[in-house]
């Protein structure tokens, strides 16, 4: 499509007038962000020659995203995640540093007041699934163990649901614990399974319209904090999960985070002597390396 010089001048004049409206902003960072957003937004509108009908549809879509969002469901997080915006923001704010563990998306299902457990305890709290023994260390990039690092963990059950998705307000499949004096940690959880993100709302409709899967690869969430260290938000994924080939709906997978969950035959002795009955169980190891807080 050829755009006349006169039309281009009209469009460019509007951009300049909108940019000038931010000149009196006293916050330099806010001014930078708003001007950059304006340039890119107007470039997008002009690039695709957006119709008024399409723009009104987009406004209605965002309105629906807001309406379905509540204290248990954050549709805007899902939108950010499925467009890759969450992962891009993580990438620019978590620059690779030596061998520090890579970060990935936070997700919408974190809860602040997860129960405290001790090393060796079970975070499932009645959630159903294959038991999994998870162990590892927390160290700095020089190889020194980090004692007393706070480790938040959360995951779905075998039906692909988090506790907050149930109506009974249960607390299951989540907890926090601390690394011991040697920087070691271990706990029982569940072997992660793939699950669809909530797709009965506008974000799900978007994914369906463009032919994308709403399914997340099987994963276990971690958030690890320690004094003077960069906070780590990450997952571990399950080697051999078929969804890895299809793709993660929020682009969260990194090769370094794919771990073996080695299935143990029923009756195999557990590391801590726990009786898991006549079912199989799995074990995995995730050694965590935290970057310095000033990088």
UniProtKB/Swiss-Prot annotation:
Alphabetized UniProt keyword annotations: Dioxygenase, Iron, Metal-binding, Oxidoreductase
Entry-linked Pfam families: Dioxygenase_C, Dioxygenase_N
Listed cofactors: Fe(3+)
Residues engaged in binding Fe cation: 162, 195, 219, 221
Name of the top EC class for this enzyme: oxidoreductase
Gene3D superfamilies noted in UniProt: Aromatic compound dioxygenase
Keyword Metal-binding among record annotations: yes
Reactions the enzyme catalyzes: benzene-1,2,4-triol + O2 = maleylacetate + 2 H(+)
GO biological process, one term: catechol-containing compound metabolic process
E.C. number: 1.13.11.37
SUPFAM superfamilies for the chain: Aromatic compound dioxygenase (SSF49482)
GO molecular function, one term: ferric iron binding
Cofactor binding note: Binds 1 Fe(3+) ion per subunit.
The protein's role, per its UniProt record: Involved in resorcinol degradation. Catalyzes the conversion of hydroxyquinol to malelylacetate. Also shows weak activity with catechol, 3-methylcatechol and 4-methylcatechol, but cannot use 4-chlorocatechol, 4-nitrocatechol or protocatechuate.
Family classification: Belongs to the intradiol ring-cleavage dioxygenase family.
Protein name: Hydroxyquinol 1,2-dioxygenase
Organism: Corynebacterium glutamicum (strain ATCC 13032 / DSM 20300 / JCM 1318 / BCRC 11384 / CCUG 27702 / LMG 3730 / NBRC 12168 / NCIMB 10025 / NRRL B-2784 / 534)
Lineage, uppermost ranks: Bacteria, Bacillati, Actinomycetota, Actinomycetes, Mycobacteriales
């Amino acid at each position: 499509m050829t755009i006349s010089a006169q039309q281009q001048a009209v469009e460019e004049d509007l951009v300049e007038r909108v940019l000038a409206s931010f000149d009196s902003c006293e916050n330099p960072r806010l001014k930078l962000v708003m001007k950059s957003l304006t340039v890119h937004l107007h470039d997008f509108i002009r690039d695709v020659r957006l119709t008024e009908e399409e723009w009104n549809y987009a406004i209605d879509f965002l309105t629906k995203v807001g309406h379905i969002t509540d204290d248990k469901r954050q549709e805007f997080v899902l939108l950010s995640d499925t467009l890759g915006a969450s992962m891009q923001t993580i990438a620019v704010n978590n620059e690779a540093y030596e061998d520090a563990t890579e970060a990935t998306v936070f997700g919408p299902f974190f809860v602040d007041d997860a129960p405290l457990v001790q090393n060796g305890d079970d975070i499932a709290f009645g959630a159903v699934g294959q038991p999994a023994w998870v162990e590892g260390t927390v160290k700095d990039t020089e190889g020194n163990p980090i004692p007393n690092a706070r480790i938040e963990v959360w995951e779905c059950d075998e039906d692909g649901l988090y506790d907050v998705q149930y109506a009974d307000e249960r607390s299951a499949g989540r907890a926090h614990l601390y690394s011991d004096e040697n920087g070691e940690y271990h706990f029982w959880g569940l072997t992660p399974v793939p699950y669809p993100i909530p797709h009965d709302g506008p974000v799900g409709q978007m994914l369906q319209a463009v032919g994308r899967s709403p399914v997340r690869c099987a994963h276990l969430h971690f958030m690890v904090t320690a004094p003077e260290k960069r906070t780590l938000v990450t997952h571990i994924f399950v080697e051999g999960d078929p969804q890895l080939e299809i793709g993660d709906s929020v682009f969260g997978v990194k090769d370094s985070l794919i771990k073996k969950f080695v299935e143990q035959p029923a009756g195999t002795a557990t590391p801590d002597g726990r009786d898991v009955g006549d079912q199989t169980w799995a074990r995995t190891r995730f050694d965590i390396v935290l970057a310095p807080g000033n990088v």
